[in-house]
Amino acid sequence: MQNSKKRKLKPQNLLIVLACICLIIGTFVVLLSNHSTSNSDSKAKTGNKHYETIATVMIDAGHGGYDGGTIAEDGTTEKDLTLALALETGKQLKKLNPGIKVVYTRTSDKVTWPEDETEDLKARVKMAKKEKADYFFSFHINSNEDPTCSGYVSYIRQDDKASEQITEYICKNLSGLDWTHDRGTLTTEFYPLHVVDEQKIPAILFEAGFSTNTKEI
């Protein structure tokens, strides 16, 4: 068994990652503010105040528990990086608009599903349906034997116009940062992904750079 180490991000990399998260959040807020018919009929709670829920966003931290995902040279696991990104995104999203209800597939390394890849993926889709999510966003981190491989990539369904619009905003904004480059927006028609394909709502799987490239993560 390999020991999972917590990587300390370099200050400049951390700032870039947080900036990316904020840009993604901003994209969601714009779209959600114009979302007139939400599946949600509940109220979001912040502190002692209650707000009408304008939409529910499920944030998925890829992998977790038995599944560490990709592993960087220093031992950092993908599951730790995606969890950090997911929690920070949710935190900032709720801060920017308390009317947005944020739910997660996991908030720690503990997972509630069996140690089976198929059941793992099914469980994430079921959770989105149970929470009546309006949007599903899954964080992943890429890796490659070549440490110079870089860039971020988005995966969406071919007929998912809302997610196509979201990814366009993300790519447009990220292109202005001195971080990394866009590897494109790919449809699951050619790259099947259960957590995206089985959703009936806008769904994106976003690979935020390469864990094997220390200039990115």
Which stretches of residues belong to each language-model region?
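Hydrophobic membrane-insertion alpha-helices, especially the h-region
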Residues: 15-31
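Active-site-adjacent mobile loop/cap segments within catalytic or ligand-binding domains
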Residues: 131, 138, 145, 184-217
